[in-house]
Amino acid sequence: MGQSFNAPYEAIGEELLSQLVDTFYERVASHPLLKPIFPSDLTETARKQKQFLTQYLGGPPLYTEEHGHPMLRARHLPFPITNERADAWLSCMKDAMDHVGLEGEIREFLFGRLELTARHMVNQTEAEDRSS
């Protein structure tokens, strides 16, 4: 892929990124597989996700400045994340991208990075999750 943008954050922009995260968490809040592993109030979760994605996409290091190194896998280990939940998470993100009109190379780039990250967070099989 011939990226036609410098920092992905610049291509998306703060406003669209904020809309994407808010729309994403609206979907997460009502998803039967995801709702049980997220807090009922997603305000702080969305705020941290905005900070993280800003930094992850080449913007200011907002997440690290407030929370330290992201250590994503370690921070997600307490939650039962299965391949099925990773798929659900990615589906919510695709829906959010559709809703806010994120398209083209930047969408492909971001979704590709998020897909790798979601797969890396998987820490249980579906069988282990059902037996918990």
From Swiss-Prot:
InterPro entries: GlbO/GLB3-like (IPR044203), Globin-like_sf (IPR009050), Globin/Proto (IPR012292), Globin_bac-like_CS (IPR019795), Hemoglobin_trunc (IPR001486)
Cofactor names: heme
Stored Pfam families: Bac_globin
A Gene Ontology molecular function term of the record: oxygen binding
UniProt keyword Nucleus, yes or no: no
CDD domains in alphabetical order: TrHb2_Bs-trHb-like_O
Annotated cofactor note: Binds 1 heme group per subunit.
Record key words, sorted: Heme, Iron, Metal-binding, Transport
Residues engaged in binding heme: 45, 48, 63, 76
Assembly, per entry: Monomer.
Family recorded in the similarity comment: Belongs to the truncated hemoglobin family. Group II subfamily.
Task of the protein: Hemoglobin-like protein that exhibits a low peroxidase activity. Its very high oxygen affinity may rule out the possibility that it is involved in oxygen transport.
Protein name: Group 2 truncated hemoglobin YjbI
Organism: Bacillus subtilis (strain 168)
